[in-house]
Amino acid sequence: MQRHTKPYENVLALIGWTPLIRLNKVTRGIRTPVYGKAEFFNPGGSIKDRIGGPIIDQAEREGRLKPGGTIVEGTSGNTGVGLAIAAALKGYKCIFTMPDKMSQEKVRLLKAFGAEVIITPTAVPADHPDNYVMMARRIAHETPNAVLANQFYNDANPQAHYETTGPEIWEQTEGRVTHFVYAAGTGGTITGVGRYLKEKNPRVQIIAGDPVGSILAEMWRTKGEGKPEGAPYKVEGIGQDKVPGTLDMGIVDDFMTVSDKESFAMARRLTREEGLFVGGSTGLIVHVALHVARRVDDPNALVVAALPDTGERYLSKLYNDEWMRENQLLEADRTTLASLLGVKSRDGGEMPVIVSVAPGASVRQALRLMSLHDVSQLPVMDGANCIGSVSDWSLSAKSLADGKLLDASVGQIMDAPFPIVDVDQSVDSVAKLLSKSNPAVLVRSNGSLEGIVTRSDMLTYMMAR
């Protein structure tokens, strides 16, 4: 735990050295360890806090920003907050342009810092005068004593990550990081971190995620020769309809596209299973990170995904079931067995993922095991295979009828094995399997059995929703 043993001169000193947290529940069945760098621990709640101060410092050094001046920027919200924090300390005004798809939480947050916020249409080409970046350029040009932060073409952006985020990851992993996963918006983070990590170890792989509808992944695949047409998407703060100057495509080893639905589903899982309250872009990044970890399948590898911002900025969107359904991003019940198992494990203390009994164990041992773990049924496992099942009711009834059976082997009197279902199957569909003859189901992830769900687990879930 970080200890703040000395006072700080101001809030800017708290930016950086965010914690690296292992993902445990969403990685169930994956051998490769995956860690998230929790950038929402920055004072402004996002990774963009890292670039606000350096951009302003650069403008001051170059003489472009003078006392009482105005900082102008086109932002999806987070860079605006990073700039607004530094501007508040230095006495500058801020004017921000934002596309209309951004959450109201972000708009209100920027206004809370005293910034003027101008909303622009999302569905316009990158070179259209009403595009949020183009409008910011015009406002900066027309406003006396104003500078454009210009995060999409400002070298201070990737340099900040080269000097801070990259070294932090290297030190926190003791140089063991093998894969870094992020998503390009301006490209500053993935470029700066990627350059630093590859300088330390050229074998480190830099993997980028991209929303379906952004052109960046296709531009990378075609080495800039393609002319893809962008399309609207809901994930905020990442993806582009043109390649930013701060994105070094050559640093990226692979680009993967992810849908809004996949991104938001993963963000909600991270909140409910890992206790990490994150935004939609984090969901996209972790979705890619898990894909990479499965593909690598090496417990000695180490995947680091930066988690850009807090979920507090999306309460009206991805954490609003009504908004999700209106945008066809949420089914009637999106809860999967992975979520249910995560809650069960968190509430269940030290109980193993699957409490089982071997076929050669005695009935007496099976009953003691059920009593010890406060369960009423057990799968009978022969190695990694479920070959049968027993229940306290069945064993008790048979033992009362014939006391000698207490010392008989479980394999002699076991019942049929429990059904096996996949971890991504919906809770509602599995509920139908938990009939009188099926008191439990075993849950499979990536080919191996990872958990058990009983009728009691299902009833607890149904009563809570």
Model-derived features: positions:
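Short aromatic/basic micro-patch
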Residues: 35, 257, 356, 389, ...
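The conserved cystathionine-beta-synthase
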Residues: 355-374, 380-382, 399, 419-438, ...
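PLP-dependent amino-acid enzyme catalytic core
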Residues: 1-344
